[in-house]
Amino acid sequence: MSYGRPPPDVEGMTSLKVDNLTYRTSPDTLRRVFEKYGRVGDVYIPRDRYTKESRGFAFVRFHDKRDAEDAMDAMDGAVLDGRELRVQMARYGRPPDSHHSRRGPPPRRYGGGGYGRRSRSPRRRRRSRSRSRSRSRSRSRSRYSRSKSRSRTRSRSRSTSKSRSARRSKSKSSSVSRSRSRSRSRSRSRSPPPVSKREPKSRSRSKSPPESPEEEGAVSS
């Protein structure tokens, strides 16, 4: 089909938006593939005004809505020219070619355009990616801080438990030593005093004094 002809009358047709096409996929190829499911009224691949290259998506028009639904169910996820296609119902009709003539390249909204899901512009994609990255970073930071706080609380609880156990052991040891000292003092107080052994006094033999001569005379008389 020629790219310079005016668009056909697509009123009453059901449009399918086909995404993820390669640059070498042609309208004739798409027509041959989709005509297996019904009568195709038109195939349109938007192209860049300056490079004339495909934008990576196309629109396939069916005269019958049932044929379009069958084609969507069969071709969504199918592989064409090494790419996995994404096929969905288009929301709006095809814009005229005069829309992107004399005014430079078409707006970026037209790329996803009024034919189905509006494709996000690269700026929006970058913003969304940066936002998602910042959110993921903030989430990871919050998780890291939470884990840090949890580890700190755990270490604090462990240290407090250790100090408490040390205090308890110290108090137990001190109480045991006190009880031992008390028992020793009580046993000492209760035990009788030791009996001191007295050494026997050596009996000193008293020597009688020598008799006087007077006493000897009296005895003899």
From Swiss-Prot:
Residue numbers bearing the N-acetylserine modification: S2
InterPro entries recorded: Nucleotide-bd_a/b_plait_sf, RBD_domain_sf, RNA-bind/splicing_reg, RRM_dom, RRM_dom_euk
Biased composition regions of type Acidic residues, renumbered to the chain: 212-221
Molecular function via GO: RNA binding
Residue ranges, compositional bias (Basic residues): 117-171, 179-189
Keywords recorded for this protein, A-Z: Acetylation, mRNA processing, mRNA splicing, Nucleus, Phosphoprotein, RNA-binding
Keyword Ligase included in the entry's annotation: no
Phosphothreonine PTM positions: T22, T25
Localization annotation: Nucleus; Nucleus, Nucleoplasm; Nucleus speckle
Highest taxon listed in the record's lineage: Eukaryota
Post-translational modification: Extensively phosphorylated on serine residues in the RS domain. Phosphorylated by SRPK2 and this causes its redistribution from the nuclear speckle to nucleoplasm and controls cell fate decision in response to cisplatin treatment. KAT5/TIP60 inhibits its phosphorylation by preventing SRPK2 nuclear translocation.
Start and end residues of each stretch annotated as Disordered: 92-221
GO terms (BP aspect): mRNA processing; RNA splicing
RRM domain mapped to chain residues: 14-92
Gene3D superfamilies in alphabetical order: 3.30.70.330
Recorded GO CC terms: nuclear speck
N6-acetyllysine modified-residue sites: K52
Modified residues (Phosphoserine): S2, S26, S189, S191, S204, S206, S208, S212, S220
Cystine pairings recorded for this chain: none
Subunit structure: In vitro, self-associates and binds SRSF1/SFRS1 (ASF/SF2), SNRP70 and U2AF1 but not U2AF2. Binds SREK1/SFRS12. Interacts with CCNL1 and CCNL2. Interacts with SCAF11. Interacts with ZRSR2/U2AF1-RS2. Interacts with CCDC55 (via C-terminus). Interacts with BRDT.
Sequence similarity: Belongs to the splicing factor SR family.
Function: Necessary for the splicing of pre-mRNA. It is required for formation of the earliest ATP-dependent splicing complex and interacts with spliceosomal components bound to both the 5'- and 3'-splice sites during spliceosome assembly. It also is required for ATP-dependent interactions of both U1 and U2 snRNPs with pre-mRNA. Interacts with other spliceosomal components, via the RS domains, to form a bridge between the 5'- and 3'-splice site binding components, U1 snRNP and U2AF. Binds to purine-rich RNA sequences, either 5'-AGSAGAGTA-3' (S=C or G) or 5'-GTTCGAGTA-3'.
PANTHER family: GLYCINE-RICH RNA-BINDING PROTEIN RZ1A, SC35-LIKE SPLICING FACTOR
Name listed for the protein in its UniProt record: Serine/arginine-rich splicing factor 2
Biological source species: Pan troglodytes (Chimpanzee)
